[in-house]
């Protein structure tokens, strides 16, 4: 059996078990939730165990507390199969001393939320888990720490980057699926296609019991792949499918299918950032579209690393999705979130990492090359100059996040240039 690769949220789980009665770890299928939580559990209930699933569901209906007995922390895997367990866990937490009693994992938002009578406020901690970042999968050296960039100490950075464009294209298409990181070549690449098949054939319908058409689901996924990193509205997605794929999809259908994909954590759009600006510039408030992993986009389009190398514009588009995935993993370990900034005049910043203490950093994503890095640095300085620092902090750092830059370093103008294969939390 493959050995366990440590995850960034391991530390978060340990910390939250010290101060919360229960933790819910949720995220896309195959991203490693169960394996990670197994490392922290003293006893485990697998709700989907085929030998016990029928009995588990019956017990969850008539005597849910009986399923919660066992050494703590007790892991309840795929709890959403029996939503009544939520209230049972909440009740147990209320009537037990101390913290760290339960770990729950879920790969979908339950369809029968009406069976949940209490939100769990104050008892539960919610942790979002995503496919592996490059630091977790071992493809990033971690020589540059995001937390250190937020530090007031202006420490110099330096690291070598040996990643080639071919490496980056492979990592985009392989994705961060833990199982794939133990494989090589085509064996690793096929995992994303298997994930896509599971989504469109089954998961998109199972999430809420609504039967959805596989062909329509595939067409929607293809269109969403073509619109990664954009604020394309549903009407644009409809038009794209109708023109590109010669099939009529109504706006209601797109909304229904998209909402289902969000419930199973396939889609994770990036919210807009609204800073205080010096001028009355209109800021776009629409979310920016992203899959939770770039390999979903390439699998949806049926393409591989070779195709990306022949189309660097598309490669750059999906490289951005990869970087957003990694930045989310690292930012949340620092109690931060990732946003997108764009004005109606077209000035934009690919990622804004905003921490709870009000600190923030501005990030532009560029695949590589001196010209693109220069463009990214210019954009970052332009955005920074527009921020009203009498009403909010100055940015802690400006960073161009690259794929093929040979080094991580700080430019004379203060802008950091960091290869994604050198970054960690």
Residue ranges and their predicted role:
Residues 1-14:
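N-terminal pre-Walker A segment at the start of P-loop NTPase domains
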Residues 25:
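Hydrophobic anchor at the beta1->P-loop junction of P-loop NTPases
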Residues 33-34:
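Conserved lysine of the Walker
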Residues 45-73:
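Short glycine-rich substrate-engagement loop in P-loop NTPases that contacts/grips substrate
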Residues 86-110, 118:
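Conserved catalytic/switch belt of AAA+ P-loop NTPases
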Residues 114-230:
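Interdomain motor-coupling "hinge/lid" segment immediately C-terminal to the ATP-binding subdomain
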Residues 181-359:
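Accessory nucleic acid-recognition modules appended to NTPase machines
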Residues 403-425:
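Domain-level recognition of nuclease-like catalytic cores that cleave nucleotide substrates
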């Amino acid at each position: 059996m493959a050995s366990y690769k440590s995850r960034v949220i391991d530390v978060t789980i340990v910390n939250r078990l010290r101060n919360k009665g229960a933790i819910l770890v949720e995220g896309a299928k195959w991203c490693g939730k169960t394996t990670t939580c197994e490392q922290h559990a003293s006893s485990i209930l697998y709700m989907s165990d085929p030998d016990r699933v029928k009995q588990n569901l019956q017990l969850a209906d008539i005597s849910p507390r009986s399923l919660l007995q066992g050494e703590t922390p007790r892991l309840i895997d795929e709890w959403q199969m029996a939503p009544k367990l939520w209230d049972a866990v909440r009740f147990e937490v209320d009537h037990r001393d101390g913290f760290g009693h339960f770990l729950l994992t879920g790969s979908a938002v339950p369809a029968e939320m009406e069976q949940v009578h209490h939100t769990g406020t104050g008892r539960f901690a919610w942790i979002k888990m995503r496919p592996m970042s490059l630091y977790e999968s071992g493809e990033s050296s971690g020589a540059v720490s995001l937390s250190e960039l937020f530090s007031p100490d202006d420490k110099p950075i330096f690291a070598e980057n040996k990643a080639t464009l071919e490496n980056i294209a492979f990592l985009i298409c392989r994705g961060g699926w833990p199982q794939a990181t133990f494989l090589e070549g085509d064996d690793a690449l096929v995992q994303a296609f298997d994930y896509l098949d599971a989504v469109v054939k089954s998961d998109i319908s199972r999430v809420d019991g609504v039967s959805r058409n596989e062909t329509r689901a595939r067409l929607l996924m293809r269109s969403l792949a073509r619109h990664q990193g954009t604020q394309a509205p549903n009407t644009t997605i409809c038009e794209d499918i109708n023109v590109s794929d010669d099939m009529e999809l109504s706006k209601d259908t797109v909304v229904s299918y998209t909402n289902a994909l969000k419930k199973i954590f396939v889609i994770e759009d990036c919210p807009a950032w609204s800073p205080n600006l010096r001028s009355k510039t209109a800021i776009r408030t629409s979310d920016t579209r992203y899959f939770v992993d770039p390999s979903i986009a390439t699998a949806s389009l049926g393409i591989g690393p070779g195709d990306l190398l022949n189309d660097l514009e598309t490669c750059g588009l999906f490289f951005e999705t990869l970087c957003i995935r990694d930045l989310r993993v690292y930012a949340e370990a620092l109690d931060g979130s990732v946003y997108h900034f764009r004005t109606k005049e077209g000035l934009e910043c690919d990622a804004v990492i905003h921490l709870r203490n009000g600190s923030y950093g501005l990030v532009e994503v560029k695949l590589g090359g001196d010209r693109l890095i220069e463009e990214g640095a210019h954009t970052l300085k332009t955005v920074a100059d527009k921020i009203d620092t009498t009403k909010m902090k100055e940015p802690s750092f400006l960073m161009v996040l690259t794929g093929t830059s040979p080094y991580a370093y700080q430019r004379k103008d203060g802008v950091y240039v960091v290869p994604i294969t050198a970054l960690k939390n």
